[in-house]
A protein has these predicted regions:
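Short, active-site-adjacent cap segments at secondary-structure transitions
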Residues: 31-33, 56-57, 66, 159-162, ...
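Glycine-rich phosphate-binding loop and adjoining helix at the ATP-binding site
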Residues: 1-45, 163-176
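ATP-binding/phosphotransfer module of carbohydrate and carboxylate kinases, centering on a glycine-rich
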Residues: 21, 40, 87, 92, ...
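Glycine-rich phosphate-binding loop of actin/hexokinase-like ATP-binding domains
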Residues: 44-99
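Short, solvent-exposed coil/turn elements at secondary-structure transition points
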Residues: 29-31, 82, 193
Length: 213
């Protein structure tokens, strides 16, 4: 059965009854955001962007992950930007997924090192792809920041490759799109760029154990 966020609490098969261990479904971006909160004790409110093979996000409010009434808050990957755009895995066209997931870099995740070596060494084709990606990402961030005016954390597989020049370019693009004067103070690179999903998935169980000790 194909699972989408918001459907995980309405499964048609009894997963829990099939496993001898406690289990829960957590959206990967929510897990990553939990890890981010663990790494940043002073972080209170933020919008976490998981920039990986697929695009995902999590909304952090008062150090809690907000999933919404139906479980699909922050599933920004399926915001339709272009009805005639590329087909998304959800079956619709032109979703943010088709513009801001790492698949748009036209390389396998295993080849990200090579791709960014080309970008930083001024390879023309690689830079064209990267600039197009940053423009689309800036467009998405600007739209979301108008809705949730908080810190935006750039995480996922992309995070270790981001440099200050990339952040500066995002601010520049956002400034050209937003109707408001924006301070360059709301974009941050993830503090937990590696193993954040697995760590975040485990942390609630660790916390539960510590509370029982």
């Amino acid at each position: 059965q194909k699972l989408y966020p918001g459907c995980l609490t309405h499964l048609s098969f009894p997963v829990k009854r099939s496993l001898p261990y406690p289990c829960r479904f957590i959206h990967d971006a929510n897990s990553a955001a939990i890890a981010e909160l663990w790494a940043a004790p002073t972080l209170k409110d933020a919008f976490y962007l998981s920039l990986s093979r697929h695009l995902a996000a999590a909304l952090i409010l008062d150090r809690k992950i907000i999933t919404g009434r139906h479980g699909h808050s922050a599933t920004i990957e399926h915001i339709q930007m272009d009805p005639d755009g590329e087909c998304c895995y959800c079956g619709r066209r032109g979703c943010l997924e088709t513009l801001c997931s790492l698949r748009t870099l036209q390389c396998d995740l295993e080849d990200l090192d090579t791709f960014f070596e080309k970008v930083r060494s001024a390879d023309r084709r690689a830079q064209e792809i990267w600039i197009t990606y940053l423009k689309n990402l800036a467009r998405a961030i600007n739209m979301l920041h108008l809705v949730y005016d908080k810190t935006f954390i750039l995480g996922g597989y992309l995070a270790p490759y981001l440099q200050q020049t990339d952040i500066d370019y995002l601010y520049q693009e956002i400034a050209e799109q937003t109707p408001f004067p924006e301070a360059h103070d709301f974009l941050e690179i993830s503090r937990m760029p590696k193993h954040n999903i697995t760590i975040g998935a485990a942390l609630p169980y660790v916390q539960q154990f510590l509370e029982q000790v």
